[in-house]
A protein has these predicted regions:
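Acidic, surface-exposed loops and disordered segments
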Residues: 1-166
Length: 166
């Protein structure tokens, strides 16, 4: 399974979610609160999301960083707003979707192994993906052969070394 990011589709995705939210609010919110809730969603999906996800050769990202620093002086503010930061955010969101997929596969008795370090340019060409698409990870799926790994015994860092209770 190949997990693909499509930051280039942010406008269509925002519009899709906005339309859903308008109907959702009309169906499930008290009539007295509907107008404000719809207005809030229109601000978020109609203006903020397009502003955050738009790309313009780094110029818009630099402006967003300055704006975030200024607003951050007055109130809590998400600071990761540069074009690079937004690309990282898109990839983290996709990785969370991949994680959910892998957990679901395990629940069905299948094993998965997320892969990084592949030739993304060739992979995009092979899959005929558009220029704006990015490959987040490749996840082979199957059933393990007992407890052995591909080349022998499996090795894991001890749990106590990577988990710290606060």
């Amino acid at each position: 399974v190949v997990f693909v990011t499509r930051q280039d589709l942010y406008r269509q995705r925002a519009q899709f979610v906005l339309e859903f939210e308008r109907g959702n609010i009309r169906r499930n919110s008290p009539e007295a609160r509907q107008a404000k809730r719809i207005r809030d969603r229109e601000l978020y999906y109609g203006r903020l999301m397009p502003f955050l996800y738009a790309r313009c050769g780094g110029i818009l990202g630099a402006f967003r960083v300055l704006l975030a620093k200024g607003i951050g002086l007055l109130r809590p503010m998400m600071r990761e707003v540069s074009e690079c930061d937004m690309r990282v955010t898109v990839n983290k969101s996709c990785a969370l979707a991949a994680q959910t997929f892998m957990i679901a596969m395990a629940a069905e008795g299948y094993d998965t192994c997320p892969l990084e370090g592949f030739d993304s340019k060739r992979m995009k060409k092979l899959l005929k993906l558009p220029h704006g698409a990015g490959i987040n990870m490749v996840v082979p799926c199957g059933m393990r052969d007992g407890e052995k790994g591909i080349w022998g015994e499996r090795c894991r860092v001890p749990f106590d070394e990577v988990y710290h209770r606060l």
